[in-house]
Amino acid sequence: MMQLIKTEYSLNSGYPIVRRTLEDKKKRVEQPGFGPESCCAVVEYRLRGNIRYAFGNSRMQVSMPPGIYTHNWVRLHGEMAALVAAIDRIERYSTDDVIPITAAYIELRPCEANCMQALRNILPEDARVYYSFEHPAQVDEWKVRANELCRV
């Protein structure tokens, strides 16, 4: 069964996936339309024997086939955007039928109503999901810490 692990929100985290997410967030906050209060996530996967990371956030536009929606893109929660990026890369570069996703880090705990159910359907049973703040109880604390991280 998927493991849900609460962890410290720190660039000095003992988990590489947490450090990677927060480092990416800090760099990307300088881009237009991207603020510290955009929920970020990273999916860790194995491809050709190496650990790789796919970043996602709630402000990213994910491409969709034309003619389905008004726009040819949608915005998803951070973890779903990261999953789409990881799966896209895996499909392009892997010939295995096994989903090589090993872990995910999401700043906010996945919401039970939607994201947690999707993660349970998509991620392998032995995947680890790390998060730092409870949703919705700690959203205000997350906003303060995210702004501190990004020095906004």
Positions of predicted regions on the chain:
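Glycine-rich short-loop/terminal segments
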Residues: 1-80, 88-95
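Short, internal active-site loops enriched in acidic
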Residues: 48, 107-111
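Hydrophobic helix-cap positions at the C-terminus of alpha-helices
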Residues: 86-89, 122
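Active-site or metal-binding loop neighborhoods of secreted/extracellular toxin and effector enzymes
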Residues: 95-98, 103-105, 113-152
